[in-house]
Regions:
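Intrinsically disordered, low-complexity segments enriched in Gly and acidic/Ser/Thr residues
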Residues: 196-287
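Transmembrane alpha-helical segments in integral membrane proteins
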Residues: 14-29, 97-100, 181-209, 235-243, ...
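Alpha-helical transmembrane segments of multi-pass integral membrane proteins
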Residues: 121-150, 179-195, 231-243
Length: 317
């Protein structure tokens, strides 16, 4: 198992570096706009803010329900609380995707653009790479945890055990398949929900009522703003899951390896546990930053009515 622990440690460090680099680029580039004011865009974004606000309230109620249900069902060993954040994020994203289109702003006449739009039309590759990379790293972490997990006293794969000679130790909870399978399924649900929200945003009717060149630019600007918010919400949910899972996994690894043989640590898994726990705490902190940025962006949507300087229509900064 020593060789496996070294591989896990190297993989964990490499994954952390990739995620941190992408996250820093994301935070540096995900500005919602620059200076100026446009009444039409301001009014349209106010309508979008109400959509997002309602979805975030629904997500908060889901979180509260998960906490309450977790207390009422202790025999479920934390599964309701484990799934609540992902379910809340998915409800917020899917709620935005299915919410009726906001009424148009303007003269009352309608128009349509012949430009074909997809879910990826209003963001850069680096923007979308953040949640995609976090999801891939998280699924890889869950798969690795499932391989090294051990059964607990009830036979559930939610423990981490170590044996050295006549000594043995185990610790729970550990994200083996008991937690890993539901978490992997929830990760896929969050990704699909984010895609649905992005596709809805890209394909929905304009919040403006005509298609002059100037209003077309405004329409594409609000779509870029909403894309940034959707990506922030999904990235925060996935990064939060990754962080909390690493903290619990690292804690279990360290506690199960916290005995000595001939004056030294029993296994190298103790070091892996420390690294995983620290990486998890950093991820949780980054989640708080992303979540705060997403909520602040929603609350200030009307103030994001901007005229981008020197940015061609259809391109992001």
């Amino acid at each position: 198992m020593a060789g496996i622990s070294v591989l896990v440690l190297l993989g964990l460090l490499a994954a952390c570096v990739v995620v941190v680099v992408l996250l820093l680029q994301f935070l540096a580039r995900a500005s919602l706009g620059v200076g100026g004011d446009d009444p039409l865009l301001r009014e349209g974004l106010g309508q979008v803010r109400r959509r997002f606000g309602g979805c975030l309230v629904a997500a908060l109620l889901i979180m509260i329900g998960g906490v309450v249900l977790n207390g009422l069902l202790p025999g479920w060993l934390g599964i309701p609380l484990t799934l609540a954040p992902g379910l809340a994020a998915s409800v917020a994203l899917l709620g935005f995707a299915v919410w009726p289109t906001a009424p148009q702003v303007g003269t009352g006449s309608t128009s349509a653009s012949l430009i074909r739009r997809s879910a990826w039309s209003f963001g850069s590759r680096r923007l979308f790479a953040v949640p995609a990379t976090v999801a891939a790293v998280y699924l890889g972490a869950l798969a690795t945890a499932a391989v090294v997990a051990s059964p607990d006293d009830a036979g559930l794969m939610r423990a981490f055990a170590q044996t050295q000679g006549n000594l043995s130790s185990s610790a729970t909870p550990f994200p083996g398949s008991f937690y890993g399978l539901p978490l992997a399924a929830m990760t896929i649900v969050v990704v699909v929900s984010a895609y649905a929200a992005l596709r809805r945003m890209a394909s929905s009717a304009s919040i403006l009522s005509s298609a002059t060149e100037d209003l077309l630019r405004i329409d594409q600007q609000w779509r870029r703003i909403v894309t940034s918010i959707i990506v922030r919400i999904s990235a925060a949910a996935l990064l939060g899951y990754l962080g909390v899972t690493l903290v619990y996994a690292g804690s279990a690894m360290h506690r199960a390896s916290d005995f000595t043989v001939n004056g030294g640590s029993a296994t190298s898994w103790s070091a892996v546990g420390w690294v995983a726990a620290i990486a998890g705490l950093v991820s949780v902190l980054a989640t708080a930053v992303l979540s705060g940025a997403a909520i602040a962006a929603v609350l200030s949507l009307r103030d994001q009515a901007v005229r981008p300087s020197g940015v061609p229509v259809g391109q992001s900064r």
